[in-house]
Amino acid sequence: MDGFYDQQVPFMVPGKSRSEECRGRPVIDRKRKFLDTDLAHDSEELFQDLSQLQEAWLAEAQVPDDEQFVPDFQSDNLVLHAPPPTKIKRELHSPSSELSSCSHEQALGANYGEKCLYNYCAYDRKPPSGFKPLTPPTTPLSPTHQNPLFPPPQATLPTSGHAPAAGPVQGVGPAPAPHSLPEPGPQQQTFAVPRPPHQPLQMPKMMPENQYPSEQRFQRQLSEPCHPFPPQPGVPGDNRPSYHRQMSEPIVPAAPPPPQGFKQEYHDPLYEHGVPGMPGPPAHGFQSPMGIKQEPRDYCVDSEVPNCQSSYMRGGYFSSSHEGFSYEKDPRLYFDDTCVVPERLEGKVKQEPTMYREGPPYQRRGSLQLWQFLVTLLDDPANAHFIAWTGRGMEFKLIEPEEVARRWGIQKNRPAMNYDKLSRSLRYYYEKGIMQKVAGERYVYKFVCDPDALFSMAFPDNQRPFLKAESECHLSEEDTLPLTHFEDSPAYLLDMDRCSSLPYAEGFAY
């Protein structure tokens, strides 16, 4: 028994009295409280320093709110090429923001299959599970396009005192993340900061719709078209302008293409009002240039150019067909204004209607000129009793000059024509080098140009000009006067008034 008792030595725990336990417990509590307080104090100081640094950086990063400073989103590496304020605002975040985002998900029950710690930098733009990114990751997307089910939270904007709940995480301090820092409005309106796509649905309820005035500014910033998902009805902010394909130009509405009728209305006043004295085309539509060329008639020139019509208006500009004898244009322009000045000296009131135009296509080149009329008369042997060739080259003689003048008046529809007026017109051919007066002989003239050229110009396309017959106004014998007695007297004009009552196709008064 002694050995047995010697073998068993009981292990005795030295007992402590109740007073010793009371003395030792406050020491342990003080140590534990000191450690907790020290940890919280250190964490608060650390986060406070980061918050102050963040405030200093945000204060330095303020830029003037104008349209000149817009970040360029077309670069492939946005972080390397973006302006420094944008880079600082997008990347530098304290761990407390990550922890607070974690606490948001844990507290509000978000289960999106994403990692708890979400990095807010521009590198990590993860789409929500179940959605494919619409554009390559080099193009920053609008939050409304990245995740239309979850509108962007109130990130960079104060939300009337509602701070994110910290959840079970203790000792976070004043939550120095930039989401809760109240910054001036113009700065937040300058940048489009990518938001995390896995924000809970409950957050946008306390966010007014007018907190997104900066979305309009970046409507024309992205470099690739983004086709949004169908907007969810009832979600705040779904009526904001969507992001479109744009470069960095300011927002201006694209000018609509000019309507097709704009050019036609532009051309109409030119032809209706631009040329006085010419009849304009009908006002119902635009006329083609060929229609404009065919509008001017002979009476435009007959109104002031009585004897020989100028080919300046008709020769090269208003002709609609050019077949045959292509070099006729220049000589016709050479003879254009030969008969203008003498007839302007007439002071009488012209009451005769214009000449009725009919005949072969020769008339398409304009009215008959005096030298053509003389060549046509000389070419017809039936007219040899009042005009004939003398046989000396290109000389011809006006045997009855008043008869020639009368026929010329019939041709030009001028009954008052006489030889004096005809001779004044012939004097201009002297200056033009077409004909000359033969010295020493009365009523004898000669053409000085080449005979072949003369006849080819007088008879284009080998067609004789159409000469009008005797006057359609049938006068009685007592009304007819000798040619030498024709005057520009009012009595003669009153006698000829009966001729003006005859119907003409173009009865334009002078």
Curated annotation (Swiss-Prot):
Q: What is an example of a GO molecular function annotated in this UniProt entry?
A: RNA polymerase II transcription regulatory region sequence-specific DNA binding
Q: Where is this region: Disordered?
A: 131-208
> Where does the protein end up?
Nucleus
List, as start-end ranges, the regions of compositional bias called Low complexity: 161-174
- Cross-link Glycyl lysine isopeptide (Lys-Gly) (interchain with G-Cter in SUMO2) maps to which residues of the chain? 350
Keyword annotations of the record: DNA-binding, Isopeptide bond, Nucleus, Phosphoprotein, Ubl conjugation
In which tissues has expression of this protein been reported? Ubiquitous.
Name a single GO cellular component. Answer: nucleus
Q: Does the keyword DNA-binding apply?
A: yes
Which residue ranges does the Swiss-Prot or TrEMBL entry mark as DNA-binding? Answer: 368-448
Q: What is its main location?
A: nucleus
Q: Which Pfam families match?
A: Ets, ETS_PEA3_N
UniProt key word DNA-binding: yes
The UniProt entry, under SMART domains, shows: ETS
Q: Where is the composition biased (Pro residues)?
A: 175-185
- Partners and quaternary state? Interacts (via C-terminal) with ZMYM5 (via N-terminal 120 amino acid region).
Q: Which family does it belong to?
A: Belongs to the ETS family.
Q: What does this protein do?
A: Binds to DNA sequences containing the consensus nucleotide core sequence 5'-GGAA.-3'.
Task: Provide the protein name.
Answer: ETS translocation variant 5
Q: Which gene encodes it?
A: ETV5
